[in-house]
């Protein structure tokens, strides 16, 4: 039984802070940072926004885009590394908000930045087996970065929701196949109770990101017998602008293939929403028959690769909900003081 994306929706907070405003506080060179990271600004959540509210907005957008009856959704899974509760599922909040309750299963996923794509794979299994009619997979985060840490320049906020189904007449993109590559690699971590994550600096690159993205990507192409030139678009996890550009070149993809989905320069790294946001931005532009190759990465570490084929249905639903580029328009900029307030970095003794 084939499975595919029936609908999708994204949400990005309207607030932004520029790299230069963060650099000014810490005495860093903004030009060097922006050139090195290929990131110029990042999204910031409002005072009353968290992973749950962002996930709800993305889920509502997905339901709206293809006029989905939420009661058909038999599974809601939210992937994040910033769930608002240690014990209390984000996914039940989402399910209640979209009126999908009570006949469904729900759970929260964690696998650093690829928790959302892991949720997609779980939904693929459920709908592919016929256990549920539709499954909803969400990747959402209000990413953390310690004051003065390199992560602070990129850690952003946003989320994406995908509704997975098995009826080809409803699919906007068929999921042709998926492949995962996973090892125990401690490149990035945050223990229970820690306010900010720690990371291995440059160690997060070669043995983390590049090993697992290339492992998953090459594994999928070998499994399917495809090559980069078989695809119209490609999307890779976007912790910054440099890593996805470099890994695309390593794998044989072109700048033109990754450009539509490369939103990190004006958004930042939305962690669990990162690769999923790139896929959404690509679907916003793709034509029927186009093929999309995507590989997510999560520290700890693993990569999930997917092959999508866009259907004629995309033209019917594309404009029914906000597109990623629409959500990036008309930002409201803030200085570091307001940013610190919004992110809860100001703490009273």
From Swiss-Prot:
One of its GO terms (biological process) is isopentenyl diphosphate biosynthetic process, mevalonate pathway. CoA binds at residues 202, 242. Belongs to the thiolase-like superfamily. Archaeal HMG-CoA synthase family. Keywords: Acyltransferase, Isoprene biosynthesis, Transferase. NCBIfam families: HMG_CoA_syn_Arc (TIGR00748), PRK04262.1 (NF003274). InterPro entries: ACP_syn_III_C (IPR013747), HMG_CoA_Synthase (IPR004656), Thiolase-like (IPR016039). (3S)-3-hydroxy-3-methylglutaryl-CoA binds at residues 29-30, 113, 154, 204, 237, 246, 269, 299. It catalyses: acetoacetyl-CoA + acetyl-CoA + H2O = (3S)-3-hydroxy-3-methylglutaryl-CoA + CoA + H(+). The active site is at 81 (proton donor/acceptor), 113 (acyl-thioester intermediate), 237 (proton donor/acceptor). Catalyzes the condensation of acetyl-CoA with acetoacetyl-CoA to form 3-hydroxy-3-methylglutaryl-CoA (HMG-CoA). Functions in the mevalonate (MVA) pathway leading to isopentenyl diphosphate (IPP), a key precursor for the biosynthesis of isoprenoid compounds that are building blocks of archaeal membrane lipids. Interacts with acetoacetyl-CoA thiolase that catalyzes the precedent step in the pathway and with a DUF35 protein. The acetoacetyl-CoA thiolase/HMG-CoA synthase complex channels the intermediate via a fused CoA-binding site, which allows for efficient coupling of the endergonic thiolase reaction with the exergonic HMGCS reaction. It is an enzyme of class 2 (transferase). The keyword Methyltransferase does not apply. Its EC number is 2.3.3.10. Gene3D superfamilies: 3.40.47.10. One of its GO terms (molecular function) is acetyl-CoA C-acetyltransferase activity. This is Hydroxymethylglutaryl-CoA synthase. Pathway: Metabolic intermediate biosynthesis; (R)-mevalonate biosynthesis; (R)-mevalonate from acetyl-CoA: step 2/3.
């Amino acid at each position: 039984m084939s499975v595919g994306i029936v609908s999708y929706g994204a949400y990005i907070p309207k607030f932004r802070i520029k790299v230069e405003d963060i650099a000014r506080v810490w005495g860093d060179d903004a030009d060097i940072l922006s050139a090195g990271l290929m990131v110029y600004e990042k999204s910031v959540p409002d005072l009353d926004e968290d992973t749950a509210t962002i996930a709800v907005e993305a889920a509502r957008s997905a339901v709206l885009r293809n006029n989905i009856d939420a009661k058909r959704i038999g599974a809601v899974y939210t992937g994040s590394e910033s769930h608002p509760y240690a014990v209390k599922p984000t996914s039940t909040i989402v399910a209640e908000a979209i009126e999908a309750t009570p006949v469904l299963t729900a759970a929260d996923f964690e696998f650093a930045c690829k928790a959302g794509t892991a949720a997609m794979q779980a939904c693929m299994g459920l709908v592919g087996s016929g256990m549920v009619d539709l499954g909803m997979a969400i990747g959402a985060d209000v990413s953390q970065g310690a004051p003065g840490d390199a992560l602070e320049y990129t850690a952003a906020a946003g989320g994406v929701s995908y509704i997975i189904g098995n009826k080809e007449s409803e699919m906007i993109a068929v999921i042709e196949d998926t492949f995962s590559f996973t090892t125990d690699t401690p490149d990035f971590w945050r223990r229970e109770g820690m306010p900010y994550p720690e990371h291995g600096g440059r160690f997060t690159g070669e043995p983390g990101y590049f090993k697992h993205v290339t492992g998953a990507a090459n594994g999928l192409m070998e499994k399917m017998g495809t090559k980069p030139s078989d695809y119209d678009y490609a999307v890779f996890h976007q912790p910054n602008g440099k890593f996805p550009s470099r890994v695309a070149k390593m794998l044989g993809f072109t700048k033109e293939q990754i450009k539509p989905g490369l939103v990190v320069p004006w958004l930042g790294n939305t962690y669990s929403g990162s690769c999923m946001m790139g896929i959404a931005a690509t679907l916003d532009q793709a034509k029927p028959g186009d093929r999309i190759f995507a590989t997510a990465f999560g520290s700890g570490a693993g990569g999930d690769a997917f092959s999508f084929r866009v259907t004629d249905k995309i033209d019917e639903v594309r404009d029914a909900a906000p597109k990623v580029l629409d959500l990036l328009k008309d930002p409201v900029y803030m200085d570091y003081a307001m940013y610190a307030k919004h992110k809860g970095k100001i703490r009273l003794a």
